[in-house]
Amino acid sequence: MSKGFTFEKNLPHQKAGVDAVMNVFVSATSHQEDNVSIRLLVNPELRLTEQQYYKNIKKVQELNGIEHVKNNYDARSNVIDVSMETGTGKTYTYTKTIFDLNKSFGINKFIIIVPTLSIKAGTVNFLKSDALKEHFRDDYEREIKTYVVESQKNAGKSTKSYMPQAIHDFVEASNFNKKYIHVLVINTGMIHSKNLNSTYDVGLLDNHFDSPFSALGAVKPFIIIDEPHKFPTGKKTWENIEKFNAQYIIRYGATFSEGYKNLVYRLTAVDAFNEDLVKGIDAYIEDIVGDGDANLKFIKSDGEEVTFELNENNKKTLFKLTKGESLSKTHSAIHDLTLDALGKNTVVLSNGIELKIGCSINPYSYDQTLADSMMRKAIKEHFKLEKEFLTQRPRIKPLTLFFIDDIEGYRDGNNIAGSLKAKFEEYVLAEANELLKIEKDEFYSNYLEKTVKDISSVHGGYFSKDNSDKDDKIEKEINEILHDKELLLSLDNPRRFIFSKWTLREGWDNPNVFQICKLRSSGSTTSKLQEVGRGLRLPVNEYMCRVKDRNFTLKYYVDFTEKDFVDSLVKEVNESSFKERVPSKFTQELKEQIRAQYPELSSRALMNELFNDEIIDDNDNFKDSDAYSRLKSKYPAAFPIGVKPGKIKKATDGKRRTKMRVGKFSELKELWELINQKAVIEYKINSENEFLSIFKSFMLEETERFTKSGVHTRIDKIYIHNDMAMSKSIVSDDDDFAKLNTMSYREFLDNLSQTIFVKHDTLHKVFCDIKDTINITEYLNIQTIRKIKSGFSKYLLNNSFNKFSLGYNLISGSIHPTKFTNADGKPLDEVLSSDLGVLQDNSKAPLDTYLFEEVFYDSELERRNITDREIQSVVVFSKIPKNSIKIPVAGGYTYSPDFAYVVKTAEGDYLNFIIETKNVDSKDSLRLEEKKKIEHAQALFNQISQSVKVEFKTQFANDDIYQLIKSALP
């Protein structure tokens, strides 16, 4: 099990967010502090004229498709905005930005401001993690040193008052040691605290600054704000933030409730869902059939007594309650709900819901049967997920999050029959015992045994009152939930159910939350996106690597009072995206966008159509204000609107499935079973010497890949210029690079041998042979091993069939179940439509010979194959589901083709075709890796053809499937 998350470098959507901020500072100059005594303690000043600042922002906005309007920029503001949807990696993005600002301009002191303690805990854990240090160390040779502002305990009888320790250490930290970037993390509560708003006897920076605000302002910090909607301008918190005297404030969030200052990047919710950067969402809505149409309204209060009006079955009844009374007095369905506080216009219920006069609740949403049903359903679905994910390789550990208001029933319910905890454990035990009876997977069976043996170990909770609790067991739970994601995700740890009372609603998340169950309504106006945000991130596997090769879904359970949850969420997702900018001219970019989806249109034909339909004029300008709209209507596939269908849906909508034309499967059966045989790739390398030669060639061709481990001397010189002391760094030409290896040669060979499965002797001989070109003893580090592994895998792929040949061994054995068949080999009635394609065409029926009743596809070329031009000789054809057939290729990669065809010739013979679609003009447009993978597929099907004839063909954008098949017929 990995000890930390594996971060991915240069994910396009995160890199774009980093680049957007960095490009704001193009042409900026860095100026050192004039005061020599504190120069190494403060940031250099980044200078940029207002004109250049405006020019940079405008250019960045144009690059990122952001409308350059007054609401999106203010050249007089030092606030820069980066909008990224929940779950897409805001924290990573701003952390990488910190490293880049340090690398480019020497900015060394940053303040990260977060709204809540839970966000602060998550941020600090992220910044301090060993995995993050390792991830950035290769590229930046720096690491972040984190300072956390906590509430300060009474200093006792000391006669002098001292600045809070974290602030003292941060302000006084010297930039002389270039190893560190200094980051102070502070939450809203601390900004308002007495600790920050006091003056102290012992000041900072040579005792010039005796208050935290003045001392922090003196270091000229860059400020990062997380969740900007929690920091409205004009309010007290923002006034205090301005006291930090930041050079620039960079705000990162999904919600900007007051609008933007200088918006430079936006990754919308639509982008996140459509590009599969987050999970899709299924909402499980618990409906009450029959009764349930009741309304309990707060109608008045005198500050001592509250009046509620119950309206049920057209009958109205008044109830008077005082503080502490139970609302069960008003309706029999209500349990565990009391009146906690009351004023003349507002009351607060024990579950945290605040009601103003005129507001109401539905009593049935507090019915115990409803809550029990939701909990049972969530537990049952959890175990279904768990069985699927923990019996595959690599394994994924799913988590389920329950939001509750019955804290006593959970925390104190151990020995109380019928308590929330007792019922939960009863339901979990029942499911686990049932699964144990039939489970054959050894690992999962043992995992279930642990569950049954110690049921209390499978769940944990975090509630705000826990912060003052001294119970060791509770403290352990909180540490796992709040601070140690890796421990929570460990397969050695049976805890996978988490309970909270909305304390975790914002600022906390875990990538492996696959279910969120709201056993009580939150009573909050928080956006639906914020609510589901706890589980939107893509999951990680047992090795802490993000899994992105398939579609995942977050299951969200709500009661009938939120029956419009999905509609509201979809509306919010689409409304949160940009209003589209309407261009005035038909550009080359638009032309390419249309032709990518309609490749049958030549450039000339497209332009002629647009001119004839009076969409554009002779100069390619749109003819009128409606022309762009007509263009989108004419070519809809090129202009997708909003979030894709099915990304957010009710669970009752079912998983998207499409019906198979089962009668046709018998005609495809032989080919389907043939291509589902397992195959093992065989490298036809005749001797160890031949392999040695290949590995040696790789090392000689890829010498620039490797980075030496070592130390060199940098000389910082202080000199006088115009009566002012200055410094500059010099690297001497005579500097001897001091080798500093992180492992011995033997350790390096052992590690490399195990990583790339090559004998020690072979590696040693190669390194001896090439020592005059590259002396491997200067590169003995883990980065070299990683680069050899990734580089050699790609080298094997790119040089297959050239420097060595290969073949395939087919493994006999049962191939069922498959994506099309059950364990007995019988065809399924329906399959997941997402396995066939993410796009759907409802306007056309599939061809009669197609295996399925609906049209799902991934490209326009695929759609044409499925819907256009029936081919008389084709008996049956089908899309090959994603990841159902994985052809092994050199270097450890795999390859999956797109279509299977069975054709009957005029002579009555049957021919089989496997088609790979490539939406490019020709083979010349393919990357080398794609060409090589196609060669591998060709080799496999050539071998299969020795027993049953199978033709493998590649279809390019301009290829008609009819002509492609016809050309191969005898």
Swiss-Prot record:
Keyword Magnesium appears in the UniProt entry: no
Keyword Nucleotide-binding part of the UniProt annotation: yes
EC number: 3.1.21.5
Pfam family, one: ResIII
Region of interest (Helicase-like domain), residue spans: 75-540
Sequence segments annotated as region (Endonuclease domain): 894-918
Keywords, sorted A to Z: ATP-binding, DNA-binding, Endonuclease, Helicase, Hydrolase, Nuclease, Nucleotide-binding, Restriction system, S-adenosyl-L-methionine
SUPFAM superfamilies: P-loop containing nucleoside triphosphate hydrolases
Transmembrane residue ranges: none
Known catalytic reactions: Endonucleolytic cleavage of DNA to give specific double-stranded fragments with terminal 5'-phosphates
UniProt cofactor(s): Mg(2+); S-adenosyl-L-methionine
Domain of life: Viruses
InterPro entries the record matches: Helicase/UvrB_N, P-loop_NTPase, RE_endonuc_C
GO MF: ATP binding; DNA binding; helicase activity; type III site-specific deoxyribonuclease activity
Any one Gene Ontology BP term: DNA restriction-modification system
Free-text function comment from the UniProt entry: A type III restriction enzyme that recognizes 2 inversely oriented double-stranded sequences 5'-AGACC-3' and cleaves DNA 25-27 base pairs downstream of one site, producing a single-strand 5' protrusion of two nucleotides. DNA restriction requires both the Res and Mod subunits. DNA topology affects its action; relaxed and negatively supercoiled DNA are digested but positively supercoiled DNA is not a good substrate.
Record note on quaternary structure: A heterotetramer with stoichiometry Res(2)Mod(2).
Notes on the domains: Has a helicase-type domain in its N-terminus and an endonuclease-type domain in its C-terminus; ATP and DNA hydrolysis activities are mediated by the N- and C-terminal domains respectively. The C-terminus is probably required for interaction with the Mod subunit; deletion of residues 897-970 is unstable as is this protein when expressed alone.
Misc. remarks from the entry: This R-M system is also known as EcoP1 and EcoP1I.
NCBIfam families according to UniProt: PRK15483.1
Similarity remark: Belongs to the type III restriction-modification system Res protein family.
Protein name per UniProt: Type III restriction-modification enzyme EcoPI Res subunit
Species name: Escherichia phage P1
